[in-house]
């Protein structure tokens, strides 16, 4: 069995395409590739005879209303009248309320501040817990020997203990290492 292939020639009609001259009024206003509503198509058709020129390079149009209301058109098609400073904008307008945006930003900042406070509190708890463990270990090591407070004032020992929250033994040791200097003793003990 053999198959045969036949070629069939169709008559194709040439379509007449009319080109508009750039001198025509409203030549820049044309139906875009986007799906347009019926009202938009009617508006474009009505504006073709006015003589509008398309303005390129505009990515966003914002119209401000009283009380902080904004109307934003993303990716607009903007046309300018050649006779006056009148602009016509096509696109989907979305309403934005600046007071709501400000409230949302304030709430977000508050949440971030609370998160930072929680992290700081956790880190302080962790450091104080590890510091308490170190203090217990140091006290256990030094509990066997008696405290030698010779050459150190009792008021200085109490002051170092209050400032650093350390044991009496550690305060005496820090004061002896710094030769009685309170500031250096506090820095060494902390």
UniProtKB/Swiss-Prot annotation:
| A molecular-function term among this protein's GO annotations | unfolded protein binding
Q: Which UniProt keywords apply?
A: Cytoplasm, Nucleus, Protein transport, Transport
Identify the SMART domains for this entry. Answer: NAC
- GO CC field: cytoplasm; nascent polypeptide-associated complex; nucleus
UniProt record, GO biological process: cotranslational protein targeting to membrane; protein targeting to membrane; protein transport
Q: Where is the composition biased (Basic and acidic residues)?
A: 30-40
Q: Where is this region: Disordered?
A: 20-42, 123-155
> Which cysteines bridge via disulfide bonds?
none
Q: Which residues fall in a compositionally biased region of kind Acidic residues? A: 138-151
Pfam families membership: NAC, UBA_HYPK
Start and end residues of each NAC-A/B domain: 37-102
Q: Which InterPro entries match?
A: EGD2/NACA0like, NAC-like_UBA, NAC_A/B_dom_sf, Nas_poly-pep-assoc_cplx_dom
The protein's superkingdom reads Eukaryota
Identify the residues that the record assigns to the UBA domain, covering every copy.
152-189
Q: Where in the cell is it found?
A: Cytoplasm; Nucleus
Stated family: Belongs to the NAC-alpha family.
Question: Subunit arrangement?
Answer: Part of the nascent polypeptide-associated complex (NAC), consisting of EGD2 and EGD1. NAC associates with ribosomes via EGD1.
* Function of the molecule: Component of the nascent polypeptide-associated complex (NAC), a dynamic component of the ribosomal exit tunnel, protecting the emerging polypeptides from interaction with other cytoplasmic proteins to ensure appropriate nascent protein targeting. The NAC complex also promotes mitochondrial protein import by enhancing productive ribosome interactions with the outer mitochondrial membrane and blocks the inappropriate interaction of ribosomes translating non-secretory nascent polypeptides with translocation sites in the membrane of the endoplasmic reticulum.
**This protein's name:** Nascent polypeptide-associated complex subunit alpha
Species source reads: Mycosarcoma maydis
